């Protein structure tokens, strides 16, 4: 059997402290209508990255509503995850010529077949996350559950050969969900296609309230000079997050803001073998400057430390060049810390209005925005507060639960 991630049950009513009552009431009402429904999310890693981040909070909340919710994780060797990482990149526009080779396709297909045989299928609804397990439905054609494919990446301009390979598997699902309409490939032929943005849990260890002086003390313990300015990027060690562009923008900004420090805080996940090489390359660049710090979940920087970085930093940077959503943007804004971010993917959803002035398209523009905000902290503070309200109204977990429960209800006919 596949691994089931061990999680408990949360209390949906906690959200009444931070969320509009009508949203919580609707979520509870939908839960009552679907009480006893067996729901299973499937992905490729129990930790690291946005999907795992979502499910850790999402599954316990679903259970609190009376939904029998589980989370199963597919298995794979390094070869399989190297292929699926390439598929992930190709959905975002990178080339993957090896997909034309029969042995590459067989590797993907055989792993999905093996995982299909080990999957606990005793559920009413499956939600399959991203390309890694996208072929499971194909190998379980006799299963009577409803199947939803959830795409978390920017698939607006996928590599044509990869899309042609994956599309038949995706089209066997009963519904597909994308973060935003512009991510939906025009050739996808599924009757039920919808959009919904991811969300954050304000009560998780990464987002819970921590006093500012405690956060600053944590950064002090990690070697930062808390009497100097700090900017931080939190992300996977991934090419699409443009860590080298962030370093270049920091160096340009430092010419006008002497003493500026940069933290690059990342995470590793079992389904991302590429991240090790990226981490090594980032480290090689960082050692040239004593004011660049590289930290990860393997060096003791977990969710609480990320929380501290996002609260104690003077600015958060998220210079992505492709981005499905970028949960770290919502996380930082929830803490009233302004973000300078790449004008990519789902990030603009989180930064409307005046915040959109800090969406950037180049290293130079990123550096200019960093300098302006560091020299005008009152502007950063005002917009940080505005950002928190945007997150409260649009990107808390209750809104995601409502959207998914509405979709599930429409599929199961209740």
Regions of interest found by a model, annotated:
Residues 40, 219-241, 247, 262-263:
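Conserved donor-binding/catalytic core segment of Leloir-type glycosyltransferases
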Residues 372, 379-393, 400-406:
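A short, well-ordered alpha-helix in the C-terminal region of glycosyltransferases
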Residues 266, 270, 275-308:
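Nucleotide-activated donor-binding/catalytic signature segment of Leloir-type glycosyltransferases, i.e.
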Residues 321:
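Aromatic "clamp/platform" in nucleotide-sugar-dependent glycosyltransferases that forms part
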Residues 329, 338-341, 351:
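Short hydrophobic beta-strand element within catalytic cores of glycosyltransferases
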Residues 353, 357-364, 372-377:
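Conserved acidic donor-binding segment of nucleotide-sugar-dependent glycosyltransferases
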Residues 1-38, 56-122, 196-202:
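A conserved catalytic-core segment of Leloir-type glycosyltransferases
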Residues 306-307, 330-334, 348-349:
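Short alpha-helical segment that forms part of, or immediately flanks, the ligand-binding pocket
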């Amino acid at each position: 059997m596949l691994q089931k991630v061990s999680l408990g049950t949360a209390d949906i009513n906690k959200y009444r402290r931070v969320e509009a009552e009508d949203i919580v009431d609707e979520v509870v009402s939908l839960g009552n209508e679907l009480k006893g429904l067996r729901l299973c999310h499937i992905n490729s890693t129990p930790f690291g990255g946005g999907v795992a981040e979502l499910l850790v909070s999402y599954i316990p909340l679903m259970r609190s509503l009376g939904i029998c919710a589980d989370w199963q994780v597919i298995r794979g060797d390094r070869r399989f995850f190297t292929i699926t990482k390439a598929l992930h990149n190709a959905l975002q526009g990178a080339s993957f010529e090896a997909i034309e080779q029969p042995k590459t396709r067989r590797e993907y297909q055989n792993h999905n077949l093996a995982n299909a045989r080990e999957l606990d299928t005793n559920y009413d609804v499956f939600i399959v996350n991203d390309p890694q397990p996208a072929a499971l439905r194909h190998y379980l054609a006799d299963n009577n559950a409803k199947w939803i494919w959830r795409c978390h990446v920017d698939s607006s301009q996928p590599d044509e050969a990869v899309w042609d390979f994956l599309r038949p598997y995706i089209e066997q699902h009963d519904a597909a969900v994308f973060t935003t309409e512009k991510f939906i490939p025009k050739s996808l032929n599924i009757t039920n296609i919808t959009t919904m943005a991811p969300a954050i849990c304000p009560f998780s260890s990464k987002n819970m309230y921590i006093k500012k002086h405690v956060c600053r003390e944590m950064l002090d313990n990690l070697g930062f000079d808390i009497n100097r300015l700090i900017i931080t990027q939190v992300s996977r060690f991934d090419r699409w997050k443009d860590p080298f562009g962030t370093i270049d923008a920091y160096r340009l900004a430092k010419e006008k803001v002497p003493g500026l420090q940069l933290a690059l805080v990342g995470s590793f996940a079992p389904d991302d073998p590429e991240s090790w090489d990226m981490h090594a390359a980032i480290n090689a660049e960082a050692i040239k400057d004593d004011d660049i710090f590289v930290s990860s979940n393997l060096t003791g920087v977990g969710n609480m430390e990320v929380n501290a970085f996002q609260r104690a930093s003077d600015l958060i940077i998220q210079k992505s060049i492709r981005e499905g959503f970028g949960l770290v943007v919502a996380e930082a804004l929830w803490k009233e810390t302004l973000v300078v971010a790449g004008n990519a993917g789902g990030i603009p959803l989180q930064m409307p209005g005046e915040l959109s002035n800090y969406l950037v398209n180049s290293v130079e523009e990123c550096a200019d925005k960093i300098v302006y905000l560091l020299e005008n902290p009152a502007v950063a503070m005002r917009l940080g507060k505005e950002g928190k309200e945007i997150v409260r109204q649009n990107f808390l977990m209750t809104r995601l639960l409502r959207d998914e429960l509405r979709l599930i209800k429409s599929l199961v006919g209740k």
